[in-house]
Amino acid sequence: MEQEAYRLISEANRRLKDVGFLFSWKFLRNVNNVKEVGNLLIRSAILFKAVKNWELAGYSFLKAAVLQSQESDFVLDTAINFVNASNMYRKIDPKKSIECLLQAIEVYKSINNFTTAAKHQMTVAEIYESCIMDLEKACMHYEYATEYYREEGSIKSANDCMIKVADCFTRMKQFDKAASVYEQIGIICMRLPILKHRIKDQFLKAILCHFCIGDKDMRLIVGYYTELYAQFIDYREYTLIMKVVESCDTCNLDILVDALREYGSVTRLDYILTIMLLEIKKNIQTQ
């Protein structure tokens, strides 16, 4: 199988070499030439993928995409093969994987397919977040995805991306920026019945971020959010917030610990909430 893959890629390279230059005008004027050589490269890529030769699979898909990008009849094929190349490189070279995805995104934007472009921006962000550990760039690409989904009117998907943005700010301990984004998400959710269940969670996180920043008049800030969303006082999240206020006012960590135990018995404390609460605990200890 791998031997056949090498034969196919050699044949593709020979045909490209015969015309003297990959992007020879004479060669590219013939759509069939692009199609035939592109097919050779794709077939070789599929075989390399089957034997888990990720580098040559990625190389072959990428070369096919670059070739097809020169002919307008192959716009979707170009984008698909940039994505295929990215998937192969992701296993061995995350940065190269991102480069391929960014090229695919540009193709999808050129044909006004912002939904697919947004989906791939999310993938770029996830690679930065989980493979390269660059939260700033992850945040930037989640923001791009948010913009693209909004462009297409996909409010729920845009909100999902905004949550990722806010979570990245929290992980970087940029609590002022996180608070602003969580608040925006909560306000957007208030306008959409399908997202109303998210309001309390986003306002909880926004308020906790204000605690993390060290804002002094927390009762005033809590009042601002209850004015925005009067039903907030009916939820367990509000009860937790008021216990945190009491704990901060009295510098009594036991109140915070008891409140978290009670809240956590019903609702799991996720990683993002844990970051915030540890920061609040540290602030109380240093008062």
Swiss-Prot record:
Q: Which domain of life is it from?
A: Viruses
Matches recorded under CDD domains: SNAP
Instruction: State whether keyword Transport applies.
Output: yes
Keyword annotations for this protein?
Protein transport, Transport
Membrane-spanning ranges: none
One term of GO molecular function: soluble NSF attachment protein activity
Biological process terms from the Gene Ontology for this record are:
protein transport; regulation of synaptic vesicle priming; SNARE complex disassembly
Keyword Transport (UniProt): yes
User: What family does the Swiss-Prot or TrEMBL record give for this protein?
Assistant: Belongs to the SNAP family.
According to UniProt, the name of this protein is: Soluble NSF attachment protein homolog FPV033
Tell me what organism the protein belongs to: Fowlpox virus (strain NVSL) (FPV)
